[in-house]
Amino acid sequence: LQQCGINAIMFQVRGEADAMYPSPYEPWSRFLTGRQGTAPNPYWDPLAWMITECHKRGMELHAWINPFRAKTKGTKELALNHPYVKHPERFFEYDGLYLFDPGLNENRRYICQIAADIVRRYDVDGIHMDDYFYPYPVAGMTIPDQATYITHKNGIDNVDDWRRYNENLFMEMMHDSIRAVKPWVKFGVSPFGIYHNVQPGSNIPGSNTRGLQNYDNLYADVLYWINKGWVDYNIPQIYWEIGHKAADYEELIKWWSRFAGGRPLFIGQDVERTVRAADLKNPQRNQMSAKFGLQRGLRGIQGSCLWYSAAVVRNEGNYATALQKNYHRTP
């Protein structure tokens, strides 16, 4: 990755209220040892190791946490020190997932406490969060947070507005929690690639797209966070192809550049989808060159973030070679 000119790594250290480091609050991750709560043997600290190895190479290390997801469908057993085991009343279940209820202030405080602990004990360059806030909608299902809404509505009469309010409170609290410990540590987010589909009569900025929406479906008002200065960088996941009928890459990067270019903006790239999609003008080539050309022609965009690193290391579609010889040949 260093040879490809990559200057920062987002390393996921908390996927489901667990830890890829020794945490005083949450259990070791099953993704590390095979069983949640079981420490690695021989013992090691993956986060500390990643920080050391990245910094030796002049690369930043951002600790990537998933804030509200507490259990995925694949997890069959929870450790005794898992937050859900201790306080099941603070969670709701949705489509096989357990999630911290964002409407509860004790949950927002707790997650910020986790991030502050990482920042305090480790020399991380940033705290990073991706696109998981309220759950992605599933047809025929409703989020079971009505009881929380009734008791914590704070005078907000619309449940959608209330959910966005909860996320706004959380993002401000997370920003402040990090700043209170180490003001130089960055706080970044990588939201879903569509903020809002343009709609007649709507005063909410929207792109010419027809897909799931941050604002309406995930209750993530990303533009508000950016305008408030709560996030230091923004990496919208624009994983679609140029020419995609519902979510065109070109349309979306231009939209984000226009509306979110006032803060550091990087484009989330799906390496595998990029190299598998044919260039619209030259079908013998993939879309890597066209995508880089489009984004580098927009003043508000400062670079790319690649999903995911293994595809780069495998040099799928000669992506790594192109980075080394062309796009990242010089800093």
PLM feature spans:
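Active-site-adjacent "subsite" loops/lids of carbohydrate-active enzymes
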Residues: 47-52, 63-121, 216-220
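Aromatic- and acidic-residue-enriched segments that line the glycan-binding/catalytic groove
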Residues: 19-34, 69-95, 131-154, 200-212
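The substrate-binding groove and active-site-proximal loops of carbohydrate-active enzymes
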Residues: 26-44, 94-112, 155-167, 210-211, ...
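Aromatic-lined substrate-binding rim segments of carbohydrate-active enzymes
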Residues: 8-11, 15-66, 72, 151-181, ...
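Aromatic-lined carbohydrate-recognition surfaces of secreted/lumenal glycan-active proteins
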Residues: 55, 60-72, 128-132, 160-215, ...
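Substrate-binding cleft of secreted/luminal carbohydrate-active enzymes
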Residues: 219-245, 260-331
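Aromatic- and acid-rich polysaccharide-binding/catalytic face
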Residues: 125, 130, 147-157, 207-208, ...
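Catalytic domains of carbohydrate-active enzymes, especially glycoside hydrolases
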Residues: 1-19, 121-126, 224, 228-234, ...
